[in-house]
Amino acid sequence: TAMVPGMFKNHFEGKNEFYKKIKTVMVVHDLNEYSDISRKDLELAEVPIDKMLKGDVLNSFDVGAFHANAIVVIDKPSDVISEKLLKQPGVAANKKKVSVIKASDDESPNYQMIADEMDQIFKKLSD
């Protein structure tokens, strides 16, 4: 999901009335080794890269943070990923967009509570 906000901005935002009110949300529920992507691959996919991001390999969450209208991070009791994610330069630069949802349990989280919190975040985007 981290590449979608930039792809949307680059290819669809402002193209016509249909896309005018669409907002993008980057949801992060897990950090893994697949979040690193080469700058060249991002450029080939025409994903815009903010000037502050340096290097040949970039973190996709950093890239997406600049273009998403909101960033939702779901922390688990055993893995508080929001703390790690907020140390990433692109996410830190966009911390005003970040909302953290704390899951109640690793194995059986309260999905209704998570959905309700996400719904509140989405409602703020449409105001």
Predicted regions and their residues:
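Catalytic cores of nucleotide-sugar-dependent glycosyltransferases that transfer UDP/GDP/TDP-activated
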Residues: T1-D127
